Amino acid sequence: MELVLHFLNTTTIGVVSLIFLLCLFLYGPLKKVHGSSKEAPTVGGAWPIFGHLPLLIGSKSPHKALGALAEKHGPLFTIKLGAKKALVVSDWEMARECFTTNDVAVSARPKLLVAELMCYNNAMLLVAPYGPYWRELRKIIVTEILSSSRVEQLQDVRVSEVQNSIVELYDVWRSQKNESDYASVELKQWFAQPIFNMVLRMVVGKRFLSATATDEKAEKCVKAVDEFMRLAGVFTVGDAIPYLRWLDFGGYEKAMKETAKELDVMISEWLEEHRQKRALGEGVDGAQDFMNVMLSSLDGKTIDGIDADTLIKSTVLTIIQAGTEASISTIIWAMCLILKNPLILENKAELDIQVGKDRCICESDISNLVYLQAVVKETLRLYAPGPLSSPREFAEDCTLGGYHVKKGTRLITNIWKIHTDPNVWSDPFEFKPDRFLTTHKDIDVKGHHFQLLPFGSGRRVCPGISFGLQTVHLALASFLHSFEILNPSTEPLDMTEAFGVTNTKATPLEVLVKPCLSPSCYKSM
């Protein structure tokens, strides 16, 4: 009997195994033939439970890791982010299909910890679900806060902050210059000052930072915004594997809650100050800061059940985080690329011709500085603020590139891979601003040309592109116009990237500076 049972068990196992192998043999090729036209290829090597998260978390440059996969698997492929599938787009034509034909389908955002815990429970425009609330809030931001006329009204704020920083650097040079008539300066810290002050003054009417003085509240504010940006760029296990969220691997959830509370207290104080001033009749006429504009538009209102205070605070945080980090990182990468390519500095002649050495840069000069604009475009091509797009989610089943994509699949656009496509860009890894004056002169960065998407495209395109470009152009042009710059070292510049929500330079940027304008210019600023 035992022999029979043993025979039956062995036979059963053998038969089942044989059937399984036969199915694999027959069905496998069939699936490959018929399935390839339906779903994009899936990258192998996924870990149990975690999927391909170790690939992204373990890489200092996830955009380059995904770019290498595109070389192997093509412009469309799928990876697993824990329990979630993500479609990676690495080709401008596929991006065009995404943000035109399928734009509505890909305008949703996935539910993420950072959006819940640090973005006022998804109230911030950048993370808000696509729908009536998002449309109404975006309309207010585009037409009333970041409109051309509103930004133009605050031109004096931008110019004065840049000029203040130039004068402060001139004073630093006078006190610290060496025997060669140069002074050393760390540019990441120096550019952070005018950009942060500029954005804060336009948003809430405050000026915090100075090269010669420190302020406890200012340091606290900058630190909190920096921490927000750091946490916004992390991959959390809870996002990929929701049932493991309670473990809070890395302590990110705790840190997000603490940072959110710190920022909310700060912005709430600003909001209360504005209400008190308005009650006294102050700050309601002339060129108002953005918080006053929002109080005029939103106070006492709700949108889709979200109260005015939450709308205002979330929008203030949106503009501060988007308007500072991206601008600073773009300017720093531009300076790195200029220093690495000394011939570029020779084109400072454009500044001398268009502006001269006896006056300061004005915003009206920027339109004539075509080479400077080309430098900024080329910088955004090589070092986009976000080399991987903010994640989106397919809100419905659709077809992309001939492949079927299921609802709920996440979308990642590899901006860096598109920007370095050799089929579009000759010498794609070389810094060649002249291409935007010749072969690619008609391509802009505003989302209309899918070969160059530093600020996204479609309905979710960044609403503050013009605002950001004005800031970058003015600050960069003013610095290059006012000072000669040198690399203090004979060693190659460290171009290591620190990947997060914004792609920043990992190490400081030390340069030598010397004034190159008439001394009267610095005195008149």
Curated annotation (Swiss-Prot):
Its cofactor is heme. GO terms for cellular component: membrane. Its main location: membrane. Keywords: Heme, Iron, Membrane, Metal-binding, Monooxygenase, Oxidoreductase. SUPFAM superfamilies: Cytochrome P450. The keyword Protein biosynthesis does not apply. One of its GO terms (molecular function) is iron ion binding. Heme binds at residue 462. The keyword Metal-binding applies. It is found in: Membrane. Induction: By fungal elicitor. Its EC number is 1.14.-.-. It comes from the Eukaryota. Belongs to the cytochrome P450 family. This is Cytochrome P450 82A4. It comes from Glycine max.
